[in-house]
């Protein structure tokens, strides 16, 4: 089987709207390494878009799924429940930030988690409005797209979107947006667009994912909490990409001294299996009537079994600490290259949720072309990187936190060579 043959078949059989970054096809993977159908090896710094904090095919996860497979694969939790769902909810309730009573519901995708968080918030408050932020990404469903603060490629030609959704700028110091600017914009929304007493929720990412790995400043999160408290609005932290040790904490909200009312989760929750969830204040979570939440595959037993294993791995292998350690090494490497690579304008992110932003020297304009060249040259050398950002000028690093030190060092050496080569500096 050849990559070229599969590519031709893919083009004939699947729509162009499903954009695919690579022109090779996976055959097998192990931890942070992946091999294509022709035997070529790649170091995976994409991890299925932040899904594999515990790596490809971790033995504990493989065993957990296999054991569950030998018992049953599906009952639909709303029809015939199972203990593992309840036990996982108990674990999430115990570990999520906040000492108040909590409840958790499970779904299948990150977009589903966001949709259900909005449903819960509207049910709890009796209000319709939602405020989101520019650069935010919340999924590809209609409500997810309405909340998302980036047009191309996610929202092109798909409207109209659900109403009563409003956007404010997200703080971004590099591009001149301060916390004060963001809060002032929310206050203006209250004057010009929607009465705050009609707003059910404010939803934000503690670190924006697709928007460029922009961390929310602590003063911004405090200000959001203050606004919510003043107006009876619920605060939703979308942790689909930040959760489960990526930022050096189990939840990114643990970096802040205020709490969200609801937290969405998905991606690395189940180590490659489709599982998402919403955890939040028990009284808020109970606002939806029986039958109002759920889904045919929501909380699938195979995915739930995998999630139990993920939590064990994070604890046993100290992945929160490992995330901080690896992230510090990567940030130091990228910072050391700024003298040789003047396009490096910013290196940022907590734990191992690291990104580098490229701007054109002199003009300070976003350099998407340079960013794409870095990504493609890295791919040619066997290193998978993802691009993000409103201007597509940011490379984000999403390596498995279980990556071995030799493979991590090899990847950083490739990255250094590629950056220097792209800018024209001898490696």
Please describe what each predicted stretch is:
Residues 1-427:
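Conserved N-terminal phosphate-binding loop of PLP-dependent enzymes in the Aspartate aminotransferase
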């Amino acid at each position: 089987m050849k990559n070229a043959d599969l590519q031709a078949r893919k083009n004939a059989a699947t729509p162009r709207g499903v954009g695919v970054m690579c022109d090779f096809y996976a055959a097998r993977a192990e931890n942070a390494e992946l091999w294509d159908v022709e035997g070529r090896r790649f170091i995976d710094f994409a991890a299925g878009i932040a899904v594999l904090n515990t790596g490809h095919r971790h033995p504990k996860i493989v065993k957990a799924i296999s054991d569950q497979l030998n018992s049953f694969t599906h009952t639909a939790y709303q029809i015939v429940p199972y203990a593992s769902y309840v036990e996982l909810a108990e674990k999430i309730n115990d570990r999520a930030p906040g000492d108040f009573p909590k409840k958790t519901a499970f779904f299948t995708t990150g977009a589903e988690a966001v949709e259900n968080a909005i449903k819960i918030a509207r049910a709890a408050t009796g209000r319709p409005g939602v405020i989101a932020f520019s650069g935010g990404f919340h999924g590809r469903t209609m409500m997810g797209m309405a909340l998302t603060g980036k047009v191309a490629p996610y929202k092109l030609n798909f409207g109209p979107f659900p109403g009563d959704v409003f956007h404010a700028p997200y703080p971004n110091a590099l591009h001149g947006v301060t916390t004060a600017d963001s809060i002032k914009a929310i206050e203006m929304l209250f004057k010009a667009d929607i009465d705050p007493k009609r707003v059910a929720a404010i939803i934000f990412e503690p670190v924006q994912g697709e928007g460029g790995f922009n961390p929310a400043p602590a003063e911004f999160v405090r200000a959001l909490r203050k606004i919510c408290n003043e107006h009876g609005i619920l605060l939703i932290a979308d942790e689909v990409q930040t959760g489960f040790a990526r930022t050096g904490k189990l939840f990114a909200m643990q970096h802040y001294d205020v709490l969200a009312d609801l937290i969405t989760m998905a991606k690395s929750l189940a180590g490659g299996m489709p599982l998402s969830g919403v955890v939040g204040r028990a009284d808020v979570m109970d606002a939806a009537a029986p039958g109002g939440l759920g889904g045919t595959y929501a909380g699938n037993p195979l995915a739930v079994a995998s999630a139990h294993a993920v939590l064990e791995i994070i604890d046993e292998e100290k992945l929160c600490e490992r995330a901080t350690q690896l992230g510090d090494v990567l940030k130091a490497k990228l910072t050391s290259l700024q003298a040789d690579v003047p396009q490096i304008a910013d290196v940022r992110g907590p734990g191992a949720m690291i990104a580098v932003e490229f701007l054109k020297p002199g003009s300070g304009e976003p350099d998407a072309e340079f960013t794409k060249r870095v990504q493609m040259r890295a791919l040619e050398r066997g290193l998978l990187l993802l691009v993000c950002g409103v201007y597509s000028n940011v490379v984000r690093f999403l390596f498995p936190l279980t990556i071995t030190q030799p493979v991590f060092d090899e990847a950083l050496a490739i990255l250094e060579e590629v950056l220097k080569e792209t800018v024209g500096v001898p490696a």
